[in-house]
Regions:
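Bacterial N-terminal signal peptides
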Residues: 12-22
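Bacterial N-terminal signal peptides that target proteins for export
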Residues: 2-14
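Short active-site neighborhood of thiol/selenol oxidoreductases, capturing the structured segment around
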Residues: 52-73
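Thiol/disulfide oxidoreductase modules built on the thioredoxin-like
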Residues: 113-117, 125-168
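Non-globular targeting/processing and membrane-anchoring segments
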Residues: 175-179
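Active-site acidic short loop of glycosyltransferases
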Residues: 56-58, 88, 116, 135
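Structural microenvironment flanking redox-active thiols in thiol-disulfide oxidoreductases
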Residues: 73-114, 125-131
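N-terminal "domain-start" segment that seeds a small globular fold
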Residues: 26-52
Length: 179
């Protein structure tokens, strides 16, 4: 058999397989709303293990990090300062620990070393959320406004001033202690 005949046979087998699988596959569960009507916030909640729905009505700051990333660790002090400056009634910060060769022991040491016990951590054990958002490197930050729309994203380290600028642009109230 020549190469063209082999290729044609393989393509026919692949097409037959696709048709067969499509015929026996279970119907997909419909999303609550069409994707074009959903906010990025809702899509993340629906298709990943991170449920953002408890934070509806708040601005949400997701920071993706690993312990081996020096820029990520440098950001922690500024993230803590944002946490202390802005009202928890208006802002939810979630530190997304991407398990890129790490595990929960790394999270425990980061919490302790950077005094972040009060912050919310999400363990991205299988890097599912990192893949979903198209993470290209560390650190990375996503800022969602109070309506659940993506207000800003960065794939580089941010300073406190950069973070505060985003909070102010999303009209996040300052905490009583910071006023």
């Amino acid at each position: 058999m020549n190469n063209k005949a082999i290729l044609r046979t393989l393509l026919r087998c692949a097409a037959l397989l696709l048709v067969t699988v499509g015929a026996v596959a279970e119907p997909a569960v419909a999303a609550e709303a069409p994707a074009e009507e959903q906010t990025p916030f809702q899509i993340i909640s629906e298709v990943s293990k991170l449920d953002l729905t408890p934070y509806a009505g708040k601005a949400v700051f997701l920071n993706f990090f690993t312990e081996w990333c020096p820029y990520c660790m440098e950001e922690m002090a500024d993230i803590k300062k944002v946490f202390e400056t802005y009202s928890p009634d208006d802002l939810q910060i979630i530190l997304v620990h991407v398990w890129d060769g790490e595990d929960e022991k790394n999270t425990a040491s980061i919490r302790k070393d950077h005094k972040l016990e009060e912050l919310t951590f999400f363990e991205d054990e299988d890097m599912e959320l990192a893949r979903l958002v198209g993470l290209q490197g560390y650190p990375a930050s996503l800022f969602f406004d109070k309506e659940g729309d993506l207000a800003f994203g960065a794939n580089y380290a941010l300073s406190y001033d950069d973070m505060a600028k985003q909070m102010d642009s999303m009209d996040v109230a300052k905490s009583e202690l910071a006023k």
